[in-house]
Amino acid sequence: MMARDEENPAVPRVRTGKFSFTCANHLILQISEKMSRGQPLSSLRLEELKIVRLICVLLFHRGLETLLLRETMNNLGVSDHAVLSRKTPQPYWPHLYRELRQAFPGLDFEAAVFDETRAARLSQRLCHPRLSGGLLTRFVQRHTGLPVVFPEDLARNGNILFSLGTLYGHRLFRLAAFFTRHWGAEAYEPLIRIICQKMWYFYLIGTGKMRITPDAFEIQRSRHETGIFTFIMEDYRTFAGTLSRHPHRPHPQQQQHHHPGPPHPPLSHPASSCLSPEAVLAARALHMPTLANDV
């Protein structure tokens, strides 16, 4: 469980930046330093690597649960299929059909869909909490690799398949699938490292293990373009004296063909510029809602 210790006076804290105070746990401080500097995941000890991966999986798990709960609440009392499927990508339905065929191997779906009596009977079977809950768990695990067990109250909802479709099209769903599929692959390590960085600092802030001063959010909002987590990591590196440890140097060809426009934030480590074409395409797919099934 993600218990907060922000208000616990017994937890000692140390200043880790101009805008941050972190609990004085040696392991947390050691991982935070490596995460802020963008060191390769191979530089982490096995103990540290297990902790980082466990936290990422935990956050994905809780995030998917929260998103499904939100969509279920939004769909309460709605019976219009056009409204229910407005945020459901088209590739979701073939995947759901294959999942239903595996759940009901002896059922003639073509006959059940066009016969009201059989359709009503199938709907009653799908409303059974154990059956629908297992269907949800298998679908999410098949596409993300995460064994998420949803509460029976969610599985009992009549619009749960539409809520699941919205979850399928969400970027967090694709990010979880990307993380579990490419964890440990050297070609994707720079991208997995960026995910671990953001997840780690989100976990520290969310659980109260790192306290951020209120003025940090005001300064970040007006002067920073890459988000609060990158802002906190830069502040962490500045305080530790490692901000320029890996300066970003553009390629000479990029300097010759430079076009005016807003600067793109560099990745956190020089190795991130050596991504394979497959890794680049996979990263771009994370930003395309219609390509959720391709991640």
From Swiss-Prot:
Region (Disordered) location: 243-273
Family assignment from sequence similarity = Belongs to the herpesviridae UL79 family.
Q: Does the keyword NADP apply?
A: no
As for subcellular location, the record says: Host nucleus
Q: In its UniProt entry, what is this protein called?
A: Protein UL79
A Pfam family for this UniProt protein?
Herpes_UL79
What does this protein do, in the record's words?
Plays a role in the expression of late transcripts bridging viral DNA replication and late gene expression during infection. Functions concordantly with UL87 to initiate transcription from over half of all active viral promoters in late infection, without affecting host transcription. Acts on and binds to viral early-late and late kinetic-class promoters.
| Cellular-component GO terms for this entry | host cell nucleus
Q: Where is the composition biased (Basic residues)?
A: 245-261
Entry keywords, A to Z: Host nucleus
- List where the protein spans the membrane: none
Carries keyword ATP-binding? Answer: no
The encoding gene is: UL79
